[in-house]
């Protein structure tokens, strides 16, 4: 089931949009302020967010940028503001789509599904574990707004571990999968790569860490 965050200070609109989306089997979580929605996201995950611009406190532009930078959530702006300058600012903030009020709920539904399809295509080359996102296309890792490119072997090693959380890989397992059967170098090269990855993850303040299981090998854990 799709989980949708809706943030708008108009309670009637929240109820209207929520009721229609729920009929389409989309679970909704509604909030009248950006601050409240971010509190919710501390413990819950959503697939997409619908955000108004004009709200007291944190406005929609600021909320959109936070959702994109810190949570990597697709965003649709739903607002009465139709000036080109507002649209420009919204897209610069990271929004994936922009819908002006008044609107047809069916059109909003079409746009939700279209945005999610685009994200699914992008997600095919990405893996997320905790707050760490690994992008295979660019061999880069991202935590929040910080991105770091990794050398090929380091990325492959981290991707292998992150794809199998809690699974313990021996040095031989890792060498076979990353360097290949015909590798003739020192198996301590694995330790060197692990050390570098730990330094990089620490620098990014990732919730993911690489643990040594004494006498067995390595695995990834998420720090709480």
Swiss-Prot record:
Keyword Phosphoprotein: yes
Response regulatory domain mapped to chain residues: 3-116
Top-level taxon of the source organism: Bacteria
Gene Ontology cellular component annotations, sorted alphabetically: cytosol; protein-DNA complex
Post-translational modification 4-aspartylphosphate, affected residues: 52
Record key words, sorted: Activator, Cytoplasm, DNA-binding, Phosphoprotein, Transcription, Transcription regulation, Two-component regulatory system, Virulence
Entry-linked PANTHER family: HEME RESPONSE REGULATOR HSSR, REGULATOR OF RPOS
The protein's name: Heme response regulator HssR
Taxonomic classification: Bacteria, Bacillati, Bacillota, Bacilli, Bacillales
């Amino acid at each position: 089931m799709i989980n949708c965050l809706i943030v708008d200070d108009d309670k009637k609109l929240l109820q209207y949009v929520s009721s229609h989306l729920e009929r389409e089997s989309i679970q909704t979580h509604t909030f009248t302020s950006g601050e409240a929605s971010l509190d919710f996201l501390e413990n819950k995950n959503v697939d997409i967010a619908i955000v108004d611009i004009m709200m007291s406190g944190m406005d929609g532009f600021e909320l959109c940028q936070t959702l994109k930078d810190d949570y990597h959530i697709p965003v649709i702006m739903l607002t009465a503001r139709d000036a080109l300058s507002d649209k420009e600012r919204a897209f610069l903030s990271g929004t994936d789509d922009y819908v002006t009020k008044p609107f047809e709920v069916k059109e909003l539904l079409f746009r939700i599904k279209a945005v999610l399809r685009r994200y699914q295509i992008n997600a095919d080359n990405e893996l997320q574990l905790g707050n760490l996102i690994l992008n295979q296309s660019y061999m880069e890792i991202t935590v929040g707004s910080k991105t770091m490119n990794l050398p090929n072997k380091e990325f492959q090693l981290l991707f292998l571990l992150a794809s199998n959380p809690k699974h313990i890989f021996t040095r031989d397992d890792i060498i076979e999968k990353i360097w290949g059967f015909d590798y003739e170098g020192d198996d301590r090269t694995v330790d060197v790569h692990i050390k570098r990855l730990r330094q990089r993850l620490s620098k990014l303040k990732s919730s993911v860490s690489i643990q040594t299981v004494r006498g067995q090998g390595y695995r990834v854990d998420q720090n709480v």
